[in-house]
């Protein structure tokens, strides 16, 4: 399972941004090309792995959108996209997020108290965005049924678990000099 994801990661280009080695991948960056078969493989794995007894699928713009949309289409479960722009809709939840890459406000719409949600993300690095999102949704009376990210890099998943957030990931990677090393891949035997 996840052979295409594995192959695409080990063949992903790596660029330096300051002291940080950044891998370029279709799931995390949308370039060079996001193949439908890769989305299919990822979404099928998530359907087997995640608690799908939910009212909404939630993702933060931008790169969680392709995977979350695929899941929504396959299940008929509505999708709520956490946006970086304020809409001033009734019930809008505003939160401040800070990661190793950015700081800013995020806005949640289309989710109500009592809803059960699956949160889907492309990559967990620092875990900062997911930590703030989960806390804000829980404070609003929303039940987090599951949190799934396609790719895990760094300590963010462990930090989330230490904060009491059970997060599932499909692959764990690290960047070693100029290449991506896949350290762990989800198995349907787990």
Curated annotation (Swiss-Prot):
Name of this protein: Hypoxanthine/guanine phosphoribosyltransferase
Protein's job: Catalyzes a salvage reaction resulting in the formation of IMP that is energically less costly than de novo synthesis.
Pathway the protein acts in: Purine metabolism; IMP biosynthesis via salvage pathway; IMP from hypoxanthine: step 1/1
Family: Belongs to the purine/pyrimidine phosphoribosyltransferase family. Archaeal HPRT subfamily.
Subcellular location: Cytoplasm
One Pfam match: Pribosyltran
Catalytic activity annotation: IMP + diphosphate = hypoxanthine + 5-phospho-alpha-D-ribose 1-diphosphate; GMP + diphosphate = guanine + 5-phospho-alpha-D-ribose 1-diphosphate
HAMAP family named in the record: Hypx_phosphoribosyltr (MF_01467)
Residue stretches spanning the membrane: none
CC terms in the record's Gene Ontology section: cytoplasm
GO BP term, pick one: IMP salvage
Predominant cellular place of this UniProt entry's protein: cytoplasm
UniProt subunit comment: Homodimer.
GO MF entry, a single one: guanine phosphoribosyltransferase activity
Keywords per UniProt: Cytoplasm, Glycosyltransferase, Purine salvage, Transferase
The enzyme's E.C. designation: 2.4.2.8
Enzyme class, first EC level, given as a word: transferase
InterPro entries per the UniProt record, alphabetical: HGPRTase-like, PRibTrfase_dom, PRTase-like, Pur/Pyrimidine_PRTase
Biological source species: Methanosalsum zhilinae (strain DSM 4017 / NBRC 107636 / OCM 62 / WeN5) (Methanohalophilus zhilinae)
This protein's encoding gene: hpt
Taxonomic placement: Archaea, Methanobacteriati, Methanobacteriota, Stenosarchaea group, Methanomicrobia
